[in-house]
Amino acid sequence: PYTGSGVLASALAMDKLCCKQMWQGIGLPTADFAVLDEQSNWPQIMQRLGGKAMVKPACEGYSIGLSRAETPEQMQQAWAEAARFAATVIAEPLMEGDEYTVAILGDQVLPSIRIEASEVFYDYQAKYFSDETQYFCPSGLTAERESELRELSMSAFKTVGCSGWGRVDVMVDNQGLFQLLEVNTVPGMT
């Protein structure tokens, strides 16, 4: 028996590419993305993603291998770094809005937490070592936006087949829309 999600849901949740494809397939919002490899057309991908991107291993956690790229050369370097951790590497447009994490316990969606990192982005250092990362609960969202985020988080969680408990991470894109990042089936309950 499991205290949370089973093996299949946990494996799916660990694969960011698979989750994004599942969410897109049912119309849930997740940022555009490109799968990168050594043959990638770096300038074309950078342009398609808006000129700035986050590059990450598709199957890694804790922001390991995550890099910001603002030029095609930086994207290629970021891909090489991320490829050290996973065979599949993805790039998404850089989203500079707020980051939220939403815990789910049984059928209850807990209040969202807004994360403010002093670093350029919420990386491994900011998550586990920085005394300057701040967590806000209540998150400051209006009741309507909080309800929207809670609904979205539960939909993302259930789409991946998760159960019991977990956490959904979301960012606000440059147009003010929520975009799903990932589901954590065994998270630290920040």
Task: State what each model feature region is.
Residues 93, 102, 157-189:
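Conserved metal-phosphate-binding beta-hairpin within the catalytic cores
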